[in-house]
Amino acid sequence: MIAYIHGKLLEATDKSCIILTPGGVGYELFLTLSAISTLPESGSDVTFYVHSVIREDAFDLYGFPCFDDREVFRTLISVDRLGPKKALAILSQFGPKDLQDLVFREDVKTLSIVPGIGPKSARQILWSLKDKMETLKSATVRSGACPVEGDRSEFLDALSGLRNLGYGDDEVRDFLKDIFDEEPDLDAGGAIRVALKKISQNK
């Protein structure tokens, strides 16, 4: 089972990337939106912790920039009827600390913004995660070691805000990445304002 990959970034889409290892083998990894948004240029060295999902008709690999994000992912998929695709969608919206806060507050409404998760499913997920809070807490304490550029929560809040304004992820993700690279301490509101200005200048 593949647990860790180091190689060069070959290609990337809005859902996955292909890593070329020194042995000449290319692996496709499914990533969270935050991981996709912080990928370097093609040809750059990258490293991911990996969770492998093996089925009769598929062999899917899910990549995470740090060990603790992978452990939170594994905690999520241990919830009954919560598969890897939905778990990845949750981590695309919420980091470990955000997720811990949702569980503590039993915030069904906020979790329900994740595509494919309605109020009933959100309530079941939050209830199930209450028994797994220690794992989430441990990951939250150590998650500062994750090599993610800028503040992930602010990035995702800005991305969500621009979606609400009618912009697609593909339209704004590169703008936001550049904005947070230049000003990593910027909050979501400031990033949205800068992004809107850049978008208008590029029309």
From Swiss-Prot:
The gene is ruvA. InterPro entries: DNA_helicase_Holl-junc_RuvA_I, Hlx-hairpin-Hlx_DNA-bd_motif, NA-bd_OB-fold, RuvA, RuvA_2-like, RuvA_C, RuvA_C_sf. GO terms for molecular function: ATP binding; four-way junction DNA binding; four-way junction helicase activity. It comes from Maridesulfovibrio salexigens (strain ATCC 14822 / DSM 2638 / NCIMB 8403 / VKM B-1763). It is found in: Cytoplasm. Homotetramer. Forms an RuvA(8)-RuvB(12)-Holliday junction (HJ) complex. HJ DNA is sandwiched between 2 RuvA tetramers; dsDNA enters through RuvA and exits via RuvB. An RuvB hexamer assembles on each DNA strand where it exits the tetramer. Each RuvB hexamer is contacted by two RuvA subunits (via domain III) on 2 adjacent RuvB subunits; this complex drives branch migration. In the full resolvosome a probable DNA-RuvA(4)-RuvB(12)-RuvC(2) complex forms which resolves the HJ. Residues 1-65 are annotated as: Domain I. Residues 155-203 are annotated as: Domain III. Its main location: cytoplasm. The RuvA-RuvB-RuvC complex processes Holliday junction (HJ) DNA during genetic recombination and DNA repair, while the RuvA-RuvB complex plays an important role in the rescue of blocked DNA replication forks via replication fork reversal (RFR). RuvA specifically binds to HJ cruciform DNA, conferring on it an open structure. The RuvB hexamer acts as an ATP-dependent pump, pulling dsDNA into and through the RuvAB complex. HJ branch migration allows RuvC to scan DNA until it finds its consensus sequence, where it cleaves and resolves the cruciform DNA. It comes from the Bacteria. Has three domains with a flexible linker between the domains II and III and assumes an 'L' shape. Domain III is highly mobile and contacts RuvB. Residues 145-155 are annotated as: Flexible linker. GO terms for biological process: DNA recombination; DNA repair. This is Holliday junction branch migration complex subunit RuvA. Keywords: Cytoplasm, DNA damage, DNA recombination, DNA repair, DNA-binding. Belongs to the RuvA family. One of its GO terms (cellular component) is Holliday junction helicase complex. Residues 66-144 are annotated as: Domain II. Pfam families: HHH_5 (PF14520), RuvA_N (PF01330).
